[in-house]
């Protein structure tokens, strides 16, 4: 399994250019946070990595490398990169139970799909009464439960890399805290490389090792999390950090 995945000079276009020469490096055991405002190109960059660009959007330049070798995104998706999506409700087939979802995921990847394995993954993400959960349909579960189920699927995949696209969006504060606890636990136990897409600098401060700031389809600043919080250089980064500090009655040093 690869130890590093690199996005090199990725450019995306629809009727007009959307993403301009984005380069990012994911490393096993480290969390790279990709931050920026809505419409900055974060989710499109993730979609390009997975080879699931929306209709009308095409990649016009760049490549993806695994341990320095060029690869097609379809060779990474699911097998080498698991995904935790922004809206879990749209990620599950409403006609299938959680048992069917989990079992089919395992079988597709050649992983054990016995009930004991599925139950262990459910319990690992803090969902009580795994036997009952596995019988539920998506519409019978809350957003927080579905997000934890999606994380359980990522655990079952045992992929060396994870893309978590706004994993705490639209969840209440308690559910958000539980999701962050789970992501921390995955990093400690499995040490994948994680691309964490978020606009919440509090999430960045808690989970990230490195940060890339995106604005208008470009990476405007990259660095380790401590440097970026203490000495942000770009105006967009300074605005994000200042807004975060203001929540605690603090100001960014000039």
Curated annotation (Swiss-Prot):
Q: Cite the ABC transporter domain residue spans from the record.
A: 2-241
Which Pfam families does this one have?
ABC_tran (PF00005)
Q: InterPro entries from the xrefs? A: AAA+_ATPase (IPR003593), ABC_Ni/Peptide_Import (IPR050388), ABC_transporter-like_ATP-bd (IPR003439), ABC_transporter-like_CS (IPR017871), Nickel_NikD (IPR014138), P-loop_NTPase (IPR027417)
Q: Which SMART domains match?
A: AAA
Q: Where does ATP bind?
A: 36-43
Topology with respect to the bilayer: Peripheral membrane protein
Assigned keywords, A-Z: ATP-binding, Cell inner membrane, Cell membrane, Ion transport, Membrane, Nickel, Nickel transport, Nucleotide-binding, Translocase, Transport
What name has this protein been given in UniProt? Answer: Nickel import ATP-binding protein NikD
Q: Which organism is the protein's source?
A: Shigella sonnei (strain Ss046)
């Amino acid at each position: 399994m690869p130890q590093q995945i690199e996005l090199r000079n990725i450019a995306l276009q629809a009727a007009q250019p959307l993403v301009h020469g984005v380069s990012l490096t994911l490393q096993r055991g480290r969390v790279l946070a990709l931050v920026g405002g809505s419409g900055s190109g974060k989710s499109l960059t993730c979609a390009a990595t997975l080879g699931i660009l929306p209709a009308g959007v095409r990649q016009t330049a760049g490549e993806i490398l695994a341990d320095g070798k060029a690869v097609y995104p379809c060779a990474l998706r699911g097998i080498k990169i698991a995904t935790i999506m922004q809206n879990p409700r749209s990620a599950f087939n409403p006609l299938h139970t959680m048992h069917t979802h989990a079992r089919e995921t395992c079988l597709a990847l050649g992983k054990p799909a016995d009930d004991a394995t599925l139950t262990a993954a459910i319990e690992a993400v803090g969902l009580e009464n795994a036997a009952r959960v596995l019988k539920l349909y998506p519409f019978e579960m809350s957003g927080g439960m579905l997000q934890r189920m999606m994380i359980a699927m990522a655990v079952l995949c045992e992929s060396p890399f994870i893309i978590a696209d706004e994993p705490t969006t639209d969840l209440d504060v308690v559910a958000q805290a539980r999701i962050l606890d789970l992501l921390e636990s995955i990093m400690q136990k499995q040490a994948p490389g994680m691309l964490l897409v978020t606009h919440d600098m509090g999430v960045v401060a808690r989970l990230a090792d490195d940060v890339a700031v995106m604005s208008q389809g470009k990476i405007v600043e990259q660095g380790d999390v401590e440097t970026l919080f203490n000495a942000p250089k770009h105006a967009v980064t300074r605005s994000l950090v200042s807004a975060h500090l203001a929540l605690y009655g603090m100001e960014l040093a000039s």
